[in-house]
Amino acid sequence: MSVAITSNNNKQPQPQPQPHLKVVNNNSTFNLYTWLRSVFQYCISLIISYTSNWLLVNNDNNNNNININYKSNNNDNNNASTSLQPKISNVKAESMKIFPDLQKSNFTTYYTTEKPLHQDVLKPVICSTGITSRILPYTNEKGELEWKFTEVQGKELDEFKMHPQQQQQQQEVKQELSPAESNESNESLAKDSSTTPASISDSPSHSETESTVSSTIIANSNQIFKCPSCDAEFRVRGYLTRHMKKHSTKKAYTCPFHDKSIYVDENNITHKCHSSGGFSRRDTYKTHLKSRHFNYAKPIKSAERSKVPGQCAMCGEHFNSAEIWCEIHVEGGECKFLPMGFKGKSRIKNRLKKQIQKNKMIDPELVPFASKVLEEVEQERQKKKNYRTTGTGSESSIQSQESESSINSTPLSMQISAPVPMPVSIQQQHQHQHQHHHHVQNQHQQHVNQQQSIATPASIYSSSASSTSSYESTHSPYTPQSSRSPLSHMYNPQQPPYFNQIAQAHQQDGQKNQVKDDYDDEYCLDVDQLNTTFVNETVANYLQIHDFHSMNQYQPGQQQQQQQQQQQQQQQRQHQQQQPSMYF
């Protein structure tokens, strides 16, 4: 390495020295500074590489040691927490990094099984919020303090308690049972009695309440129900109601052949199918019909009668079984010897009708009887059709009659709307027309009154004023005609001519004003007076009377005006005649 090297005249750039090798050129001179610098860089690079490798190896060893210790400590459940804490703290102190490695999380989730529910949780607890309810503390078996509702005996509810006399009356009412009541067991009564406030115990525990309820049920189960008509006794209330139907005079079922089955033999002994012919139950009624009024082909036991054919004892018709005979022939009302108006309750026949109406499959046993039921169904359909056709026709005829009667009965003033009041200038222009109209109306009214009297508004006004003065003395003068006595509607008396009616109405204005002055509020109307027809009638009558007054008032003024006009016309004519004579 200690060799002298000469350089050429043309100098070239020297390459950078590498850390591991030293390049020596023949043309370069020896430089100590560059050599030392390269050696120093090479040493530093070696130191850095060795230290990095050493650190990586130590980290891997530490991680393996931590995992081994963690697994061993998990097996020991009691010493797990104490053994892990110091080791982990030492590892953290030795290998602290600025950027830690991504590893498994230090948080672990422990799943614990759910505890089973206690049996006492499923039991109901008495809870009350009434007047006498109290919430009191008590200590349980574990010594813990708990709170529960209890009923404390007090005098708050004494006002609502029943006296002994009322309790006896209530018990007597309960014992009086009607035959129509349904069968109810004694257990339901025990349940009702157990739910009363008196049966709830004052203790907070649930076992004591169960014992009290069971004791009340046992006490009520020993109760006996006696029949008031005989000495029969029953433990179930429903049996008593069924028994009491025997003592009732009116039975639910009666034998239809009872009257025809009575006969007297040679020894003057009367024979009947039954003592009274009445039955309180359907099953006993049907057994009576099958045993007394159905003839079997051969003598047979009562248990085997349902499948044996036979004949009707009254009409002799043959049937495959007594059940079909009873349901269709007797209850269906097909036997000829049934009394008039007999209505049975045939369940089989009703089922057949429903099957035929809904077009369903018919039972093969009931096919022979389906023809009769089909005829009845068709008859019912025809009746419904006839009723609909006649009903629509009758309704239309009734509506037409009502419309005609309403047209004939309506007054003349109601067919035309009520006149509207006009100013005085327009009235003066149409006075002549009003006079002509009233004159024609007067002649027409006289002609109509000879044939029949029509209830015009003016006639109603005058008739009410003349014939019901006594009624108005006790009632309001504004009451309409419809609210008066119904006897006034039974006849329609003849009325005087139209103008005479108006004159009579004006003569009686003084009497009406005296009655109206007795009332403070003249505008107080009844409910019946709010009807539109009554308002139209009153307005029309008022306007007609007003027109008549205006005509009578303006007649003298019109006569004077006509006389003045005639005088002026005569003066003008005379003046015209005098003018040509002056020119001549």
Curated annotation (Swiss-Prot):
Localisation per UniProt entry: Cell membrane; Nucleus
Composition bias, Low complexity: 203-214, 394-407, 442-480
Membrane topology reported for the UniProt record: Peripheral membrane protein
Domain of life: Eukaryota
Primary subcellular site in the record, as a coarse category: membrane
Biased composition (Polar residues): 1-11, 180-202, 481-496
Keyword flag Zinc-finger: yes
ZnF (C2H2-type) intervals: 225-247
Designated name of the protein: Transcriptional regulator STP2
Species, as recorded: Candida albicans (strain SC5314 / ATCC MYA-2876) (Yeast)
Gene name tied to this protein: STP2
